[in-house]
Amino acid sequence: MPVHSREKKENNHDEMEVDYGENEGSTSEEEETESSSVSEEGDSSEMDDEDCERRRMECLDEMSNLEKQFTDLKDQLYKERLSQVDAKLQEVIAGKAPEYLEPLAALQENMQIRTKVAGIYRELCLESVKNKYECEIQASRQHCESEKLLLYDTVQSELEEKIRRLEEDRHSIDITSELWNDELQSRKKRKDPFSPDKKKPVVVSGPYIVYMLQDLDILEDWTTIRKAMATLGPHRVKPEPPVKLEKHLHSARSEEGRLYYDGEWYGRGQTIYIDKKDECPTSAIITTINHDEVWFKRPDGSKSKLYISQLQKGKYSIKHNHN
């Protein structure tokens, strides 16, 4: 071991010093007496061997002592390090070690920040979902209201159309009933065929038509004709004098609940402009399209109708409102 080599070098150095001192002593003694030097040299050599052996034993003892001290120090250092590690481990287990507390504090701070951010994000998501829900509810309500208004207008227009047709039927029935009553009254007023009075012949001037049908058949035919004219349109119920047919200036017709006018199609619920000659155009919403007429609703809530023949003749014109 290095300790042994060092101790050996020290022993050799001490021996050299001893030898050097002894040599000086011997030279001085040689100068004093030459006779006594020979005897003393023999004695000094015997002392040197004993001295070396004694010093060697001392060095060995000292080396063993040093090795023992080194081993004791090493064991003591190991025990101290072990006790320090055990103490640090106990601090970590107890949660008091600085090496554990500092990262733990950083982790807790990071956890608090992320928890706060997650809470804010959750609130924003809930608010977004709530806004979407309210928007959908509002859109559904608006759609329902618009559909209700449209359905109300449609039902109202259909009911008005039915009422109009019923009124026409009532008028036609009144006419036929009057004719029927007149016929009954005329029958009651007839005289007895066995009476001597004869009916005076009717004098007719000019060409005339002789009807071979009975009065009841004529009344039935008249009622059927009136009903057929009522279904064609209100403007054809009343008999009109024959007029000269006018040439249609515009193309207008009704097909499957839609209106075709001058190359464009119009449907129920669309907003249009109605233009009449010498008048300002007005805005309206189409509510019903029949075979020969169009019902529309004005902004003030009033309803009116427009005959397709009026569009064909150019009395009225319509166009889309794109606003």
Curated annotation (Swiss-Prot):
Residues 1-56 are annotated as: Disordered. The keyword Zinc does not apply. One of its GO terms (cellular component) is Sin3-type complex. GO terms for molecular function: histone deacetylase binding. Residues 1-15 have a biased composition (Basic and acidic residues). Keywords: Coiled coil, Nucleus, Repressor, Transcription, Transcription regulation. Signal peptide: none annotated. Its main location: nucleus. InterPro entries: Sds3. Residues 50-82, 147-178 form a coiled coil. One of its GO terms (biological process) is negative regulation of transcription by RNA polymerase II. Pfam families: Sds3 (PF08598). It is found in: Nucleus. Residues 16-51 have a biased composition (Acidic residues). It comes from the Eukaryota. Belongs to the BRMS1 family. Involved in the histone deacetylase (HDAC1)-dependent transcriptional repression activity. This is Breast cancer metastasis-suppressor 1-like protein. It comes from Gallus gallus. The lineage of its organism: Eukaryota, Metazoa, Chordata, Craniata, Vertebrata. The gene is BRMS1L.
